[in-house]
């Protein structure tokens, strides 16, 4: 009833590794059940007749030094319903494994490669996971992991996806020094719990996440000259704020404007000029 991709890349802040999961399903709030990840440890997706305890147990095993194959073996040997379970795991080094129990509803299966595990059940056919793997392989390895995961999810959906239909989707990416203010390991944690087109909505939310919760790149920073400062001052005052800092805080653009007022993000400047 679900298709997912679990992966590792090195596009985190400063080039640090990051891990993530993207998942979609004809199931309410799939993001509440399937994905789990911790920076510096790994990521996993537990699905089919999902054993949700595998999230905590699996990450604990990885944290203790188990490789993905060892962690998988431990999880399976302690679960009497292993034949009904499906799971994908990627460990700290990018070793990937995927398990599909023999009792999972057709079509069910998975594909693995370096840094990636893809799996699904109740799918239209193997073309779903194959399309996801092809999209992953074709993606730019330097691109943000969230974008690569989403592209794979879109490919799986377009190839047929869950044969029962669509309902929810989720995206989770972790990396040290990520998140709001760079003081967490959660770079992306987005969920569409109940929608006709959940993957499309997830894409819209990721655009917003990038704007509000991702730091500007050097290419996106516009130096605030005296001339631009005067323009900005007029714009923020017209919007009812005493200065740029007040406008920035009110509109939640803290990660897109320098604390010392030396630069402003090109997108945020466009928004300010448009009076939005």
Q: Could you describe each region identified by the protein language model?
A:
Residues 1-226:
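N-terminal nucleophile
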Residues 61, 78, 135, 152, ...:
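Structured segments of extracytoplasmic/periplasmic soluble domains
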Residues 218-257:
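A short amphipathic alpha-helical interaction element
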Residues 252-276:
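Extracellular LysM carbohydrate-binding repeats and other cell-envelope/extracellular binding modules
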């Amino acid at each position: 009833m679900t298709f997912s991709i679990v992966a590792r890349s090195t596009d985190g802040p400063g080039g640090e590794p990051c891990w993530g999961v993207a998942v979609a399903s004809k199931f309410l709030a799939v993001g509440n059940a399937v994905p789990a990840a911790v920076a510096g440890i790994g990521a996993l997706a537990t699905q089919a007749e999902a054993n949700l305890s595998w999230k905590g147990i699996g990450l604990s095993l990885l944290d203790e030094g188990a490789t993905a194959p060892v962690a998988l073996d431990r999880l399976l040997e302690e679960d009497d319903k292993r034949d009904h379970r499906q799971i994908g795991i990627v460990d700290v080094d990018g070793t990937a494994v995927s398990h599909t129990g023999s009792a999972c509803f057709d079509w069910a299966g998975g594909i693995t490669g370096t840094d990636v595990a893809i799996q699904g059940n109740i799918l239209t056919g193997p073309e779903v996971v194959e399309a996801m793997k092809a999209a992953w392989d074709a993606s730019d390895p330097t691109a943000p992991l969230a974008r690569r995961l989403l592209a794979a999810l879109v490919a799986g959906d377009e190839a047929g996806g869950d044969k029962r239909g669509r309902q929810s989707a989720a995206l989770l990416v972790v990396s040290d020094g990520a998140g709001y203010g760079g003081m967490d390991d959660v770079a992306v944690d987005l969920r569409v719990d109940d929608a006709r087109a959940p993957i499309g909505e997830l894409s819209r939310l990721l655009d917003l996440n990038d704007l509000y919760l991702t730091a500007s790149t050097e290419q996106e920073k516009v130096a605030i000259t005296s001339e631009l400062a005067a323009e900005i001052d007029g714009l923020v005052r017209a919007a009812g704020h005493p200065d740029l800092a007040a406008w920035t805080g009110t509109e939640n653009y803290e990660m897109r404007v320098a604390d010392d007022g030396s630069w402003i993000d090109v997108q945020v400047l466009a928004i300010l000029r448009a009076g939005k």
